């Protein structure tokens, strides 16, 4: 997921769709065979209340509400598109966008590894064409509720990511006494300090230790960081930036900055290092993420300039401390105290590194008492076709100093195997793919598949490293059949800003290279990329073997009782339609709902009250799953759920009334199902 101001709109040239008269019933029938729900109960067109719940609760009566098509006010058009799989910064972040400093760090490289997050940061993209959004609920959807009040764009400032940071994990026996016993997803930064950096003598493995200590973040010597790059640090934005929520700077790199910022502190405080090792955008690479000119040093102005530097320094200290703490607070072992009493008592120690975890607990497998307990949760059901996943601690180059834990990945996979047979990864750094493969082997899981992920960056060094590691993984694999395919890049076009044409060319070249390598090795695997639904066009469809779109109704401001239908309709109109006449498969690569933290009304607008628009909450998450999961399972709709586990370190990016960054998991960071949350059992039917 990425970026602030996530916008949903129809693609170029589709303005005729703005009126119902231009939409024919033929479109309705065209997609009947792929609808994840079936026609059934009628809806009240005035209030959207159906006689039955679920996607199946709508008939053609919804046409009564389809007639509104006012011209959009320019002030309501968002300037960029994003999904929530990758971002951790923006207007929804600390300080309403973290004036200048953090944004310059995080607006362009959302799910990067390590130092890449800090290099080549861009400012607000002013030249991104405004999206022409259109409420896609309506008459031609066989199960769509009465559409909400018409909007021309569904924007939201978001800052979270599935792979920007991994699904949270704890060391074995790590104390989580500070987590709420009633609803751990509702705690805030002051309730749950996530790191006690002074106590982390052995590494970043106390995810829940604390900000409660007065110790400063761990000292970092930038000269010891691999691929350290320093592009300098801009202290403050110009006066006109960040004034409107709907024009917030893309926050694509927030998660990467948080996950790997330790590797670039030298760039914040020091001078230039070798340009070749920098992770800034490569001129002409075609994947640059925005317009640097939007963030400039303040003009000379006496006290104003001085105050700007002071404020900048303070914000820099706060953000760096939070980010470093988030990275260092990353843990490797058991996420809580759910281990059985028969488990090794040594695993209840307060802190364990990856090496210590293995030394104490051995290489966990299906016969380990701890694993047996994790794999026997009657409240988990295998009803998700796929789940997005990134292990904790795989930010490069931080992982070179603090390696992620194999046992931690094995614990995660023990849980994930009860939810899905299909896991999507986002990158190849830090042996994350190899650890997942090892976990599957140790757990003796026979039906789990993996979508390989390759992070594509504006910096050729990063992309090259990721692709080369993909080749090594494939070459070393004992059985290629465990892989479902390779996803080359996630939301690379979104991060390209206005330079989508050049970015698309670069992205397609990378995809073609991977295809050529597979062909040379006689490997029959599809090669795809994932991006916003409205970033797909015929050219990209032709290049990809599978069309993968990230679609999040929450950031469209869609009320939850209409969210499932809206998601399906948006996917149909933006993605499925592009594959007509081809044999291309379509997959929703990210979809989910946060369990708490406020509400989003889309368009970058402030909600008039706490119940307007899309409301985050456990009840709402239950409703979205109730309306989506089993119907999609029955009808074969292929998607990846975002996500399995909360990522509590992201709490540093919550701000104001937008406090959902750390609350997208079905489970808390200790792998406990959230209180009150109910995963549908779909009558015993399971995903295959």
UniProtKB/Swiss-Prot annotation:
What superkingdom heads the lineage?
Eukaryota
Which reaction does this enzyme catalyse, per its entry? Hydrolysis of (1->3)-beta-D-glucosidic linkages in (1->3)-beta-D-glucans
Record EC number: 3.2.1.39
Listed A to Z, the keywords are: Carbohydrate metabolism, Cell membrane, Cell wall biogenesis/degradation, Glycoprotein, Hydrolase, Membrane, Polysaccharide degradation, Signal-anchor, Transmembrane, Transmembrane helix
Question: Compositional bias (Polar residues) at which positions?
Answer: 175-188
Q: Where in the cell is it found?
A: Cell membrane
Disordered: annotated segments: 1-91, 126-148, 168-195, 334-363
- Bilayer topology: Single-pass type II membrane protein
Q: Which residues cross the membrane?
A: 308-328
Q: Where is the active site?
A: 491, 590
Q: Which organism is it from?
A: Aspergillus fumigatus (strain ATCC MYA-4609 / CBS 101355 / FGSC A1100 / Af293) (Neosartorya fumigata)
- Per its record, how is this protein called by name? Probable glucan endo-1,3-beta-glucosidase btgC
Summary of the function given for this chain in its UniProt record:
Glucanases play a role in cell expansion during growth, in cell-cell fusion during mating, and in spore release during sporulation. This enzyme may be involved in beta-glucan degradation. Active on laminarin and lichenan.
Top EC category: hydrolase
Which family, according to the similarity comment? Belongs to the glycosyl hydrolase 17 family.
Q: Tell me the GO BP annotations in alphabetical order.
A: cell wall organization; polysaccharide catabolic process
Low complexity composition-biased segments: 341-355
GO MF annotations in UniProt: glucan endo-1,3-beta-D-glucosidase activity
Q: What is its main location?
A: membrane
Per the UniProt topology annotation, the Cytoplasmic ranges are 1-307
């Amino acid at each position: 997921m990425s970026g602030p101001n996530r916008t949903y709109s129809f693609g170029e040239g589709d303005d005729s769709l703005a009126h119902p008269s231009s939409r024919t019933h033929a479109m309705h029938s065209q997609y009947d065979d792929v609808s994840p729900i079936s026609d059934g109960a009628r809806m009240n067109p005035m209030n959207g209340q159906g006689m039955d719940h679920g996607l199946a609760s709508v008939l053609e009566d919804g046409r009564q509400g389809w007639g509104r098509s006012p011209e959009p006010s320019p002030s309501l058009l968002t300037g960029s598109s994003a999904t929530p799989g990758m971002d951790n910064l923006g207007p929804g972040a600390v300080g309403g966008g973290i004036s200048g400093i953090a944004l310059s760090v995080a607006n362009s490289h959302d799910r990067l590894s390590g130092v890449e997050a800090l290099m080549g940061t861009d400012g607000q993209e002013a030249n991104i064409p405004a999206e022409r959004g259109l409420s896609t609920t309506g008459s031609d959807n066989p199960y769509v509720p009465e559409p909400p009040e018409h909007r021309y764009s569904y924007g939201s400032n978001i800052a979270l990511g599935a792979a920007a940071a991994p699904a949270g994990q704890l060391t074995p026996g790590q104390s989580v006494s500070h987590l709420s016993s009633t609803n751990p997803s509702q705690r805030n930064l002051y309730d749950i300090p996530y790191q006690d950096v002074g106590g982390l003598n052995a590494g970043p493995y106390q995810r829940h230790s604390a900000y409660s200590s007065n110790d400063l973040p761990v000292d970092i010597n930038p000269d010891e960081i691999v691929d350290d790059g320093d592009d300098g640090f801009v202290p403050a934005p110009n006066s006109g930036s960040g004034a409107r929520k709907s024009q917030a700077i893309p926050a694509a790199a927030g998660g990467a900055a948080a996950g790997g910022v330790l590797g670039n502190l030298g760039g914040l405080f020091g001078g230039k290092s070798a340009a070749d090792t920098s992770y800034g955008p490569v001129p002409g690479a075609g994947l640059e993420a925005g317009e640097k000119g939007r963030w400039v040093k303040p003009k000379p102005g006496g006290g104003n300039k001085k105050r700007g530097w002071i404020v900048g320094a303070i914000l820099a200290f706060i953000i760096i401390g939070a980010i470093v703490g988030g990275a260092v607070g990353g843990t490797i072992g058991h996420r809580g105290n759910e281990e059985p009493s028969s488990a090794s008592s040594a695993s209840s120690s307060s802190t364990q590194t990856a090496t210590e975890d293995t030394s104490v607990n051995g290489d966990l497998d299906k016969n380990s008492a701890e694993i047996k307990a994790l794999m026997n949760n009657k409240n988990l059901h295998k009803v998700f076709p796929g789940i997005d996943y990134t292990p904790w601690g795989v930010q490069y180059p931080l992982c070179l100093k603090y390696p992620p834990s194999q046992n931690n990945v094995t614990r995660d996979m023990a849980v994930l195997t009860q939810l899905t047979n299909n896991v999507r990864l986002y990158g190849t750094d830090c042996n994350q793919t190899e650890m997942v493969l090892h976990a599957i082997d140790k757990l003796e899981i026979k039906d789990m598949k993996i979508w390989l992920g390759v992070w594509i960056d504006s910096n050729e060094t990063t992309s090259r490293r990721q692709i080369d590691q993909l080749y090594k993984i494939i070459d070393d694999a004992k059985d290629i059949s465990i892989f479902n395919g390779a996803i080359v890049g996630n939301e690379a076009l979104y991060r390209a800003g206005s330079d989508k044409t050049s970015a698309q060319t670069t992205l397609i070249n990378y995809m073609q290279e991977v295809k050529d390598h597979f062909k040379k090795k006689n490997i029959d695997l599809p090669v795809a990329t994932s991006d916003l639904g409205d970033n797909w066009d015929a050219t990209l469809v032709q290049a990809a073997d599978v069309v993968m779109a990230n679609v999040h109704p929450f950031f469209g401001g869609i009320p939850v009782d209409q969210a499932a239908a809206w998601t399906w309709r948006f996917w149909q109109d933006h993605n499925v339609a592009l594959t007509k006449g081809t044999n291309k498969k379509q997959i929703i690569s990210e979809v989910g709902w946060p369990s708490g933290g406020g509400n989003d009304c889309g368009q970058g607008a402030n909600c008039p009250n706490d119940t307007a628009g899309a409301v985050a909450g456990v009840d709402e998450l239950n409703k979205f799953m109730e309306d989506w999961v089993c119907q999609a399972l029955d009808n074969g709709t292929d998607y990846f759920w975002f996500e399995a586990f909360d990522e509590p370190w992201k709490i540093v990016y919550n701000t104001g009334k937008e406090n959902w960054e750390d609350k997208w998991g079905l489970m808390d960071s200790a792998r406990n199902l959230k209180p009150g949350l109910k995963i549908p059992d779909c009558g015993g039917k399971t995903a295959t």
